[in-house]
């Protein structure tokens, strides 16, 4: 008989991240070049828009990840130690990870899968979509918080400290960081989550090697991306104190810009004014965004072989296993701490 009890959601937030976003928005808009923080894009509605965008036919990263998982999840499951705590750092795409979970169940691996997300409602819907009654060996739970909250929880929770840990970073998550910050983030994961049982603990992540501008820009301008981008402005308006009818942003004043940066090997997503200089609403009314000025909100770095090697070495990690498929630019990498 499978799991019958509904999975439990643990609130591991050490502070409410929503409270810090307005300060991050203001700081980003006062910097040069102007930016918006990533947290602004992960409201419940923002995540739903992203999921619709990532399911578009031209959005190759998701389709390639699923192809590889369908064909090679059994081998991936074999690489995860029995008794592991599996933490999915960003659990919005259940349709991907379900292939790995089913392979772990088939292998009779006694693991606990924790979905981590910023959105409580998205966590709830993710867990409700898992057919838990079909699983006996795999247990399910969830963590409500940020990446940092999740790593702190792994390190400081006595009952799981010394168990093997497997951190999932699907969806090209690591590509959203600058190259130095990506290495620092992986190094932080290693120091907080892989040290309790280092020989059996690992990170399982995806990276994209595609540097063909037409393929990349077609993917990142696929259906659904404009509502995703503009939803961030609506969400921002809810986080700032209201002054009558005035709002900080009017989403109708902005449009989405997609560019490939040849020098840095990354896709860049920005919002720019539609037709004129824009003075923001109170309390950011001292900020003016010029007509052709970009507010960058996202980058997706692509990694060739040399850049991957440098990333892993800088993080103090080495790849022990690679899962790829002919014709796919996305691949899965299992990383472990370098032996001392």
Curated annotation (Swiss-Prot):
InterPro entries: EgtD_Methyltrsf_superfamily, MeTrfase_dom, MeTrfase_EgtD-like, SAM-dependent_MTases_sf, SAM_MeTrfase_EasF-type_put. It comes from Arthroderma otae (strain ATCC MYA-4605 / CBS 113480) (Microsporum canis). This is 4-dimethylallyltryptophan N-methyltransferase easF. The gene is easF. Homodimer. The keyword Lyase does not apply. Keywords: Alkaloid metabolism, Methyltransferase, S-adenosyl-L-methionine, Transferase. 4-dimethylallyltryptophan N-methyltransferase; part of the gene cluster that mediates the biosynthesis of fungal ergot alkaloid. DmaW catalyzes the first step of ergot alkaloid biosynthesis by condensing dimethylallyl diphosphate (DMAP) and tryptophan to form 4-dimethylallyl-L-tryptophan. The second step is catalyzed by the methyltransferase easF that methylates 4-dimethylallyl-L-tryptophan in the presence of S-adenosyl-L-methionine, resulting in the formation of 4-dimethylallyl-L-abrine. GO terms for molecular function: methyltransferase activity. The keyword Methyltransferase applies. GO terms for biological process: indole alkaloid biosynthetic process; methylation. It catalyses: 4-(3-methylbut-2-enyl)-L-tryptophan + S-adenosyl-L-methionine = 4-(3-methylbut-2-enyl)-L-abrine + S-adenosyl-L-homocysteine + H(+). It comes from the Eukaryota. Its EC number is 2.1.1.261. Pfam families: Methyltransf_33 (PF10017). Pathway: Alkaloid biosynthesis; ergot alkaloid biosynthesis. Belongs to the methyltransferase superfamily.
């Amino acid at each position: 008989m499978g799991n019958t009890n509904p999975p439990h959601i643990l609130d591991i937030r050490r502070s409410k991240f929503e409270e810090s976003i307005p300060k991050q928005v203001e700081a980003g808009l006062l910097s040069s070049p102007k930016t918006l923080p990533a947290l602004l894009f992960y409201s419940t509605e923002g995540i739903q828009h992203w999921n619709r965008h990532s399911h578009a036919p031209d959005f190759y990263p998701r389709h390639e990840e699923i192809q590889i998982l369908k064909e090679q999840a059994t081998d991936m499951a074999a690489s995860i130690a029995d008794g592991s705590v599996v933490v999915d750092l960003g659990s919005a795409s259940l349709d991907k990870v379900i292939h790995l979970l089913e392979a772990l169940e088939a292998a009779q691996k006694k693991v606990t899968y924790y979905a981590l997300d910023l959105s409580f409602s998205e966590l709830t819907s993710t867990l409700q979509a898992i057919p838990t009654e079909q699983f006996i060996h795999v247990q399910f739970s969830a963590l409500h918080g940020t990446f940092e909250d999740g790593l702190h929880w792994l390190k400081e929770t006595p009952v799981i400290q010394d168990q093997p840990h497997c951190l999932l970073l699907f969806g090209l998550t690591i590509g959203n960081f600058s190259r130095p910050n990506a290495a620092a983030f992986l190094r932080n994961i290693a120091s907080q989550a892989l040290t309790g049982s280092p020989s059996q603990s690992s990170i399982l992540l995806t990276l994209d090697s595609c540097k063909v501008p037409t393929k990349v820009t077609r993917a990142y301008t696929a259906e659904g991306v404009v509502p995703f981008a503009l939803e961030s402005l609506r969400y921002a308006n809810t986080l700032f104190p209201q002054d009558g009818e005035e709002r900080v942003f009017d989403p109708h004043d902005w449009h989405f810009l997609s560019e490939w940066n040849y020098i840095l090997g990354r896709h860049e997503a920005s919002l720019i004014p539609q037709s004129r200089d824009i003075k923001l609403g109170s309390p950011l009314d001292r900020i003016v965004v010029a007509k052709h000025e970009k507010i960058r909100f996202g980058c997706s770095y692509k990694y060739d072989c040399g850049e991957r090697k440098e990333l892993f070495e800088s993080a103090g990690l080495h790849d022990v296993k690679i899962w790829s498929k002919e014709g796919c630019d996305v691949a899965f990498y299992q990383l472990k701490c370098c032996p001392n």
